[in-house]
């Protein structure tokens, strides 16, 4: 699957490369699991509602979430830092 990051999500991903390699590793594990299992698997996948309907969330840590949508053969990542 292609991994497409929004500009903000890419900046957040680069932030983790500098600030915390363990969180970066967890993000990469979640992305690999999304490729394998879609909207099920590790990180407690949760369908989002309201203005984020159509997107899914997975726990990176208690504080941070990976927010994404699967569209065809692409994973569209809109956030990997903070909480929706």
Feature roles, as predicted:
Residues 2-4, 8-25, 29, 42, ...:
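Enriched for short, Lys/Arg-rich terminal
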